[in-house]
Amino acid sequence: MLPSQSPAIFTVSRLNQTVRLLLEHEMGQVWISGEISNFTQPASGHWYFTLKDDTAQVRCAMFRNSNRRVTFRPQHGQQVLVRANITLYEPRGDYQIIVESMQPAGEGLLQQKYEQLKAKLQAEGLFDLQYKKPLPSPAHCVGVITSKTGAALHDILHVLKRRDPSLPVIIYPTAVQGDDAPGQIVRAIELANQRNECDVLIVGRGGGSLEDLWSFNDERVAQAIFASRIPVVSAVGHETDVTIADFVADLRAPTPSAAAEVVSRNQQELLRQVQSTRQRLEMAMDYYLANRTRRFTQIHHRLQQQHPQLRLARQQTMLERLQKRMSFALENQLKRAGQQQQRLTQRLNQQNPQPKIHRAQTRIQQLEYRLAETLRAQLSATRERFGNAVTHLEAVSPLSTLARGYSVTTATDGKVLKKVKQVKAGEMLTTRLEDGWVESEVKNIQPIKKSRKKVH
């Protein structure tokens, strides 16, 4: 009988799939060292082999797109270091690893240490560009930290002598290979900084295997290069060799000879540049002098043309011509003026105003007499008309009537009273007499009855 809660039941396919997923996701990519056995390479180009140690073994596969990057031919019994993904071949339930990269065991371990140290120093910021110091341009003294018997020193000195023989070089001899090499390299860098004799350092050696170059993958050397106040150029091995020192240094040169070229000036090239510059300066000077000479000649010619004596002579000649022209013009002007005066005198004599003035005076006297007579006659007639008008006006003037004892009475509204019905008792009246006005109040009104005429 089954229990009340049945356990999960896997099919074989599901079991293998679950195990494969667990292996791939939980384990991920790992490094494995071991001995190769049962190595085969079918026509497909893939590699199939077993990786084992003294007590266990595991099947491995390395596909063609991965094994083409391996630089050696794996041999039976060879110790190797592989980077692989763990998986399960589901159809048969075979546990195996898929190899991505392979190295001989010795170099593989070193490469693993290299990658770990590189990641650590990069995380600490030793590779950051902000810490890179610029190289002096030009360098006044070069320090070389390398083996005093190695080919690297010979190459560096040869290039420096060829390019810049006058450049001082200070050698700090040190071992570049072996257990003591990292410590000696560190002390040489510190000594160069203490003495402060150089303004740039070349740290390097010639080519070799990964083990030969391992001193320059040492963390102590990397820290010393980073702490150096003097700019450091790394020159380790060949162009394909890349060490930790290359990442930390202020500049990486592919070879020691290239490092020497970087820190030195090419005196032959400088000499050619100086000669070229000298030729350009000479040509420019010749052109400048020729131009100045031509300009000087022009100015000198102009000065000769503008000499004071020449100018004075020209002005004197011009003055004489002007004097002659002025004298001739003055004589002609006086001659024309005399002729004009004679003509005007003749015209004046012909147009003598005395007879006209006499006739005009006689005419004026006649007109004055006639004007006086006319004015007297008009004045007499006007006086007569004025007298008649005054007499007529006096005859019809109200003042004359008032003078005979009559008066004119007006109401308060200014109207002349003609009948008693125009006023009422109590009203004020104004009366105009010959010599003034009289104001009076109406006390009583008595109209006069008119008698009717009998008609026969």
Swiss-Prot record:
One Gene Ontology term of the molecular function aspect: exodeoxyribonuclease VII activity
Organism: Shigella dysenteriae serotype 1 (strain Sd197)
Quaternary state and interactors: Heterooligomer composed of large and small subunits.
Sequence similarity: Belongs to the XseA family.
Protein name: Exodeoxyribonuclease 7 large subunit
One annotated Gene Ontology cellular component of this protein: cytoplasm
Encoding gene, per UniProt annotation: xseA
EC number(s) reported in the record: 3.1.11.6
Stated role: Bidirectionally degrades single-stranded DNA into large acid-insoluble oligonucleotides, which are then degraded further into small acid-soluble oligonucleotides.
